[in-house]
Structure formats: C-alpha cells, structure tokens
C-alpha cells in the first residue's frame, strides 16, 4: 500500500479548541486488564458521550476459532456517558451497562414519576473496581510524543497510539 494513500486525514487534523486551548482527545475502550481494544482520535471539543457508540464499533478481538468478537459483555463507564441515546444503543446491541448517573439527572428523575433511581449494590461493587481506563491512559501517555501530541498529522498520532498500545499488550501478562 502506498504511504500517501494510507488513510484519510481529518480536515482539522484531530485538533480542536477546548478550555485549555488547542488539544486532541483520545477515546478508548480497554479490557479488564487495561489493554486497549479500540481507540479513536478526535478534536478536543468533541464530547466523550457522543463518541461512545463509534468507539465501541471499532472493537474486534480475535478468539481461538470463529469470527472476532465485536461486543463486550458489559460496559463500565464513568459519569460522562449516561445519556439516553447511549443507554438505548447499548440495550439495542445487548450490552449490559454499569454507568452511574450524574447528580443533575438524579434530581430530575426524582421530580418525575417512573422508574425508581437505584444503582444497586452489585452495580456499586462492580463500579468500585480499580479505574482501569485511567491507568491505561497513564500507561500510554508515558510516551512523551503521545502525552504532548508532537505529531502534526492525526494519522501519525494514531499510529503512535497504536504502537504504544501494542507494546502495552506485549508487556502485560495474559
């Protein structure tokens, strides 16, 4: 394959304005051991919640036999993801979710009749586990080029993330 035709470069080079200035956001999905399963690179102004379905659609994990797995059994996410659209998408695809609700959503649901608010003890125990995704990000950002986004093009930054994630897979005990 020709290096000039290797992939479409986004028009904004995955650099967008956010509170801290021009920045890039990496959206990733990892397994329980903190190994990257899929990731996307977008501009800094893109909300995490809008990229959940797109990021989950990138998962492809090869097994011993058959076609690769493309869906997790369960998704554990933080308070940035509890939108109705995300929960509906997860239900449609048969993915169980553990996503705590934000305080403003809980207060809104208390004012309205309907399903009671219950995060449940089993959900709390499941969510209480170590923050694996944050540690995965920290492990990837030990590479200075990824932490500082020293690449001009998004595809080069994406390739650096891919290399760091691969090395992380190789050094993590299975």
Go through the PLM ranges and name each one:
Residues 1-104, 161-164, 171-174:
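Polybasic low-complexity intrinsically disordered regions
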Residues 47, 128, 155-158:
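A generic structural signal for residues located within well-ordered alpha-helices
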Residues 64-153:
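Helix-centered, glycine/charged polyanion-binding patches within enzymatic domains
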Residues 139-140, 156-167:
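Charged alpha-helix within mobile-element recombinases
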